[in-house]
UniProtKB/Swiss-Prot annotation:
Reactions this protein catalyses: a 1,2-diacyl-sn-glycero-3-phosphocholine + H2O = a 1,2-diacyl-sn-glycero-3-phosphate + choline + H(+)
UniProt cofactor(s): Ca(2+)
Residues annotated as catalytic: H339, K341, D346, H667, K669, D674
Binding-site list for a 1,2-diacyl-sn-glycero-3-phosphate: H339, Q528, H667
Role played: Hydrolyzes glycerol-phospholipids at the terminal phosphodiesteric bond to generate phosphatidic acids (PA). Active with phosphatidylcholine (PC), phosphatidylethanolamine (PE), phosphatidylglycerol (PG), and phosphatidylserine (PS) as substrates. No activity toward phosphatidylinositol (PI) or PIP2. Positively mediates plant responses to hyperosmotic stresses and promotes root growth, flowering, and stress avoidance. Not involved in the abscisic acid regulation of stomatal movement and transpirational water loss.
Protein's organism: Arabidopsis thaliana
Domain PLD phosphodiesterase, residue spans: 334-371, 662-689
Gene that encodes it: PLDALPHA3
GO molecular function, one term: phospholipase D activity
E.C. number(s) listed in UniProt: 3.1.4.4
Similarity annotation: Belongs to the phospholipase D family. C2-PLD subfamily.
Domain comment (free text): C2 domain is a calcium-binding fold, and the binding promotes the protein association with membranes. A lower affinity toward calcium can be anticipated for PLD alpha due to the absence of two potential calcium ligands.
The protein's name: Phospholipase D alpha 3
Annotated GO CC locations: cytoplasm; membrane
Amino acid sequence: MTEQLLLHGTLEVKIYRIDKLHQRSRFNLCGKGNKEPTGKKTQSQIKRLTDSCTSLFGGHLYATIDLDRSRVARTMMRRHPKWLQSFHVYTAHSISKIIFTVKEDEPVSASLIGRAYLPVTEVITGQPIDRWLDILDENRRPIQGGSKLHVRVKFTHVTQDVNWNKGIILPSFNGVPNAYFNQREGCKVTLYQDAHVLNEYPDVTLTGGQVIYKHHRCWEEIFDAIWEAKHLIYIAGWSVNTDVTLVRDPKRTRPGGDLKLGELLKKKAEENVTVLMLVWDDRTSHEVFKRDGLMMTHDQETYDYFKNTKVRCVLCPRNPDNGDSIVQGFEVATMFTHHQKTIVVDSEVDGSLTKRRIVSFLGGIDLCDGRYDTVEHPLFGTLNSVHANDFHQPNFDGASIKKGGPREPWHDIHCKLDGPAAWDVLYNFEQRWMKQGSGRRYLISMAQLAEITVPPLPIVQPDNEEGWTVQVFRSIDDGAVEGFPEDPREAASIGLISGKDNVIERSIQDAYVNAIRRAKNFIYIENQYFLGSSFGWNSRDINLNEINALQLIPKEISLKIVSKIEAGERFSVYIVIPLWPEGKPGSASVQAILDWQRRTMEMMYTDIIIALRKKGLDANPRDYLTFFCLGNREKGKVGEYLPPEKPEANSDYARAQESRRFMIYVHSKMMIVDDEYIIIGSANINQRSMDGGRDTEIAMGAYQPSHLLSTNNMRPVGQIFSFRISLWLEHLRVTTNAFQCPESEECIRMVNATADELWGLYSAQEYPRNDDLPGHLLSYPISIGSNGEVTNLAGTEFFPDTNAKVVGEKSNYLPPILTS
């Protein structure tokens, strides 16, 4: 077997051209050979040859780059095979060779011309390779005419990255390289946990009583921002429900707070505020099919509500880009979504009666039903108050307020950007509106904006300790935005990736990879999904070539832990995910996702255990990497809502109601690194969100220059640190000094022990307490074998109150592209 080596770092690849490509003729496509005929006769011959080749090849040839089985790049399609195209590729793959494949595009798929190979043993040295490679057929023989492909390859090992393992070092740190949006200095950032925080919830304090974090209230601040807008309100969402009420806390009323979202937006439009909405068009929501659609996003209802009003609401399908084949185009249009959740408004400027500023919101929370929740995450106690008209429980058949709880609690994270980065969120909306809205029609022009707003300049002075530096990232392609350059060289210069005949931005995945590589001490993740790096999965019972869940984040995390074990340094990773993905837990789609998740975990724990053994350490892998979920269990209370109906006997619904427990659904999309850097957005840690050509996403990465590991060699104690402590207080209901050093064995073991105890209380057949569950952070119910294999926790084959397997089950009929 050919030797495999770990290629962990960055590949710089340039594909130039093919020297000649014969096809039943002595002439070649590129016009290069031993003799160059001249004259009108020869020109006629060449024209006939070109016409015949266009017929044979469709006039469209492209090349791909594979790391063994993993496709990492592809060129644009060209009539003649001369690309001159460069690629910046992050790698974390154990491979034997780099494969360059030349294909002819066809309407349905593509046909193979040939492949060229470059052994990893040559690449891994780091020396530049500039070479003509033989193009071979499937039997490894030169194709007709002995054609060659000209490539240049340069590998840089991850340890040679100037930021590797160093955190953020100023002034040299310039943000994530090769990204579409640059990092913006002098911003303000507001961080939100959940849609609302009650007055009774305490501020976060350190030992000695020092207040380090005051809570902000997401939906109230969104309401205020919309209410106070004078010129523009731009909303993009996966789901927008006109019936939701943003302000519900009776102790925090305000003028207009009783308005529903739809009423509020119509009111603002009547005040001559430009209100534009981009709502994902669920292709399954159609009068002919099911009006609310398979995803129940209310898109058609929202569109109908605003019809013939001053609010401009556009339903946006996830249109395929021009480079997709018919099959790929069908996949994109029917399987993928517009998943961004953004709001852009104008807001007042202190000290100015005429000028306004741009403020943007982004994150995981859609403006729709089921999202309003507090850090208490009640199951039954609010069904006769704030959730009486907002009962959300999609995990049980027939669930409704009439049959009672448990409702599905919702944990999420969002943020507000103020300053130059807020404008990048505005630009994103404008690009999307021009592509799928109404062109420039209805958008406030840049000239008008210049008259009514202050320019996108820093709003915080460099010496202000509360200042932020922010960079906006996306997963998106030119099927969804206007303005991406067609020339691949121009696209590459602004951080874009050129595909067959499309242009992709994949900067969210790049942001995660860079942040993980910079990490020194710990990583804390909350995400709705956690699966990927399928190139590293065990292939004993699956064909890895069919999975294509290639995003690098899980492998980058396990390799970071391995590097720390090898160096004899502490490093801890905490990952919070839902108990299962939203939906019927025993359904084929949920079980398939859980199977991918289990394989991802297994790959990571295998890497860690191998590294521990090499160092002669008999350590628990959960001291380095640990997974959690959230759940609640409530005791009945006097005056609680009494449903007039009952769930079907012996159903999951009935059992959950009897046991009075249910998972808290983790919908967050957040990563904190070393308490100095945070990523928040709409992107899940799966292929759909990180691909760029699948679901469209937006995120931001941010830090406070005055609160870095490199500042005075002290631990950061800025807003990111405080936000993490606040989240841990929400989940664990306690704070301790150990939480200030998450990488320590003391901290991770304390958190694991508490979560183990809480899982025991949550899963117990008979609940032994007379009060609610004393914390929400539960150990994910898996067991880790001696070689890294992941199985269900002993005695927990199925999720509580269900017959659904904890570790999932491979689907034999659902396409992996749908569930990965």
